[in-house]
Amino acid sequence: SHTFMKKIFVYLTLGFTTLTSYAATPLWMRDIQISPDGTEIAFCYKGDIYKVPAKGGAATQLTTQDSYESNPIWSPDGRQIAFASDRYGNFDVFVMPANGGAAQRLTTNSTGETPSAFTPDGKYILFSAAIQDPVESALFPRSAMTELYKVPVTGGRTEQVLGTPAEAICFDKSGNLFFYQDQKGFEDQWRKHHTSSITRDIWTYDTRTGKHSNLTRHAGEDRNPILAPDGQTLYFLSERNGGSFNVYAFPLAQPESVKAVTDFKTHPVRFLSMSNNGTLCYGYDGEIYTQQGGSAPQKVQIEITRDDPSQVEYLNYTNGATSATVSPDGKQIGFIIRGEVFVTSADYA
């Protein structure tokens, strides 16, 4: 009751033990992408962009803002990295030198923008955002269904490429064709073992003719297309054979001839990429792996040194409790504030 809350003061301490520079083996690295030459891997960790040698070692922190940075994308020459940052309130596309330095903001729309790929000539960055549906391809719900745009790497006016969702873009070397995963309806991208009419498929889009072609038609999820350096084989992530996400591949000439590349049993494989020398790179169970041809996956041993600030905050609550209950003997009261369970004596002692 209101009286009950007036008499009980709850003090919450939020945060973690204050640490001054520490080294740790990180877990739950996300948005993983290997560099074109296969020597480095960019990834997101705790809201910052890092890169690490593909053979493992100490990671280099590239962004240091208080904001959240994610989705690093290498330029074709490996000299720049595009990424998303919400440092101005919503996610915009930025680009920075791959060795670190000042980042340039490329997009300013009030919606969120997520970079997907550079064009092969390195002149444009493709990104997804829910900005403006064309009349002929408006989708519901509008805020969840994006369109595909491009922006010059040097900055300038954005241009709509497709009026329908197209994510995880992968170009062929000519730049005339790109592969993408579709989005037919809204579904949490982290949901596992999802089968329905709106599961993602992999498509090609011919920029010269405007033709879309579906390459995968199975009932589950197919996503994250990656074209091999020879331009003949497409790698992708899929939930097939009753299992979780693994890496699969098929020859472009025979999309129905799908073969498994990895055979992880427990957790999904995420964030697939490939270097120009054919090295696969992906995330599994929070860590990063590389894989050459038909050889076994190799875990990348990574060390991250951070100087995290104190994140302790003291909060005083006199209202807002939910799910209150009284013990059977009437002497104690249990309640929840901010997702935490507290117990106090009924006489407020």
Which residue stretches match the model-derived regions?
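Positively charged n-region of N-terminal signal peptides that target proteins for export
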Residues: 2-8
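Bacterial N-terminal signal peptides
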Residues: 11-20
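A flexible loop/linker signature enriched in serine peptidases of the S9 family
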Residues: 25-26, 44-50, 58, 63-69, ...
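Conserved beta-strand position repeated across blades of beta-propeller domains
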Residues: 33, 73, 117, 170, ...
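Residue-level detector of Asp-centered blade-edge/turn motifs that repeat once per structural unit
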Residues: 36-37, 76-77, 120-121, 173-174, ...
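Glycine-rich phosphate/pyrophosphate-binding loop
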Residues: 315, 320-326
